[in-house]
């Protein structure tokens, strides 16, 4: 997804990122984070490793876990379970098993075959029942117009899709905007966001 390799990550760490932070005061936290982002372009995997290490050090400095540094902590985190792509009846059985294990949110991969996707989602919805959430991940497979058409079909069939993840190619920010403005299904960007700058661009 990122295009990074293990060698490239190690190189970015040794040649740029570690040299940028070694010997500096972790209490100067905001400047450290900015320096990490400025010292080399891209290389988001290596930057993420340093970012996490700096937050951990900052928490140790003030004897606080990182979740308390961020604020808004919670004792329970809701996650989903991905139902592997298979025949609709197999996916329905997998969904029933997931529900029995306590999952309230089901994730389904879509994008390769619209008719089969609808059959799979229908089976998953019937197995999950009306009270549980179903979210889908198209993995950049659709064009903007195709995404709107298919999402509208899903809504018309009463599938109750909670959100769609990355419906269009990662670079197509205008396409994400197009889908967001024309579909009732909320759009989640995934591969489109690899940096704080990407996040700002998405929000704009």
Question: Which positions does each model-derived feature cover?
Answer:
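Metal- or metallocofactor-binding catalytic centers and their adjacent structured scaffolds
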Residues: 1-61
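Flexible, glycine/charged-enriched surface loops at secondary-structure junctions
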Residues: 27-29, 66-69, 161-167
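Beta-strand segments within the central parallel beta-sheet cores of soluble alpha/beta enzyme folds
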Residues: 31-32, 68-72, 109
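Short, charged beta->alpha transition segments
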Residues: 55, 65-68, 91-96
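N-terminal small/glycine-rich loop or linker at the start of catalytic domains
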Residues: 60-87, 184
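Active-site beta->alpha loop and helix N-cap motifs at the rims of alpha/beta catalytic domains
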Residues: 83-92, 97, 114, 118
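Catalytic domains of carbohydrate-active enzymes, especially glycoside hydrolases
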Residues: 97-109
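Catalytic core of soluble alpha/beta enzymes
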Residues: 108-204
């Amino acid at each position: 997804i990122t295009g990074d390799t293990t060698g490239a990550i190690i190189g970015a760490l040794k040649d740029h990122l570690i040299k940028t932070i070694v010997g500096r005061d972790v209490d100067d936290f905001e400047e450290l984070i900015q320096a990490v982002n400025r010292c080399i372009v891209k290389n988001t995997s290596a930057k993420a490793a340093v970012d996490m290490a700096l937050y951990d050090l900052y928490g140790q400095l003030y004897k606080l876990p990182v979740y308390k540094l961020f604020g808004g902590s919670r004792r329970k985190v809701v996650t989903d379970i991905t139902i592997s792509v298979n025949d609709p009846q197999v996916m329905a059985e997998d969904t029933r098993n997931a529900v029995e294990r306590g999952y309230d949110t089901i994730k389904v991969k879509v994008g390769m075959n619209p008719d089969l996707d609808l059959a799979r989602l229908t089976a998953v919805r019937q197995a999950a029942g009306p009270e549980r959430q179903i979210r889908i991940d198209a993995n950049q497979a659709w064009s903007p117009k195709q995404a709107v058409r298919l999402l509208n079909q899903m809504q018309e069939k009463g599938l109750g899709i909670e959100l769609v993840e990355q419906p269009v190619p990662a670079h197509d920010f205008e396409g994400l905007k197009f889908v967001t403005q024309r579909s009732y299904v909320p759009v989640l960007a995934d591969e489109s966001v690899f940096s704080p700058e990407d996040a700002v661009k998405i929000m704009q």
